[in-house]
Amino acid sequence: MALLCLVYVIAYHALFVGALVAGHLQTHSVLNLTHLVLAVFSAINAWICVCEIALLVHSGAIRREYEGFNAKLGVGHLPPIFLFERASLSQIFSLRYWAVMWSTYSVLDPSYSDTTTFGFCVDVGNGVTTLLPTLLWAAGMTWPILSARLMGAMGIAMYWQELYGTVIYFFQYVFNRRFDRSPRAHVLGIVVPANGIWIACPALGIWASY
């Protein structure tokens, strides 16, 4: 049975965050706002890491889909958002399915359809190098499985990488006036919040790690 992709995404995040919050409450007998925010961010980042691995594996298909969107809809016009289309279980467990995230986002910033750009490389790097640390950090801040020193060192390294990479990406997006190709609503409603999350939450993670 095919459901809206958004249903799967919400269910995944609810299970991920719910498990961490319940574990923290059971272990420490307290709800903590910093833990909650970083639990939500860990869930988001782990999902995006998988999508970023799809960016690497299916870069050629992403380029072809992006060019198809431009030919059909015109430059800067978003196709139907994949989150609101139906998908089967077999599709959502396929890297190929999540590659459409990048062919869609390439309409706003063509960096993701070009393997020579900083945007492509920094996101692939995030996906390949931070998936396992994200999962380990999420578990470690919930259950006492790692020493505080190791958690702090890992958190500072991981979150600094995410923060710095996002700041440089957003700089090149603005400096190269990528926003000129998109309606202001798309820039303010998609690009700015998406990058803002990866600046604000890693900054909080660095503070918590210290």
Task: Annotate the PLM regions.
Residues 1, 101-120, 179-192:
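Juxtamembrane membrane-interface segments at transmembrane-helix boundaries in membrane proteins
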Residues 1-12, 32-48, 119-126, 148-158, ...:
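Transmembrane alpha-helices of multi-pass eukaryotic membrane proteins
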Residues 11-18, 196-208:
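Hydrophobic cores of alpha-helical transmembrane segments in multi-pass inner/ER membrane proteins
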Residues 30-37, 57-106, 177-183:
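Interhelical loop segments of eukaryotic multi-pass membrane proteins
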Residues 126-138:
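Core segments of transmembrane alpha-helices
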Residues 137-151:
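Juxtamembrane helix-break-helix junctions at the cytosolic face
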Residues 157-194:
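Juxtamembrane loop segments immediately following a transmembrane helix
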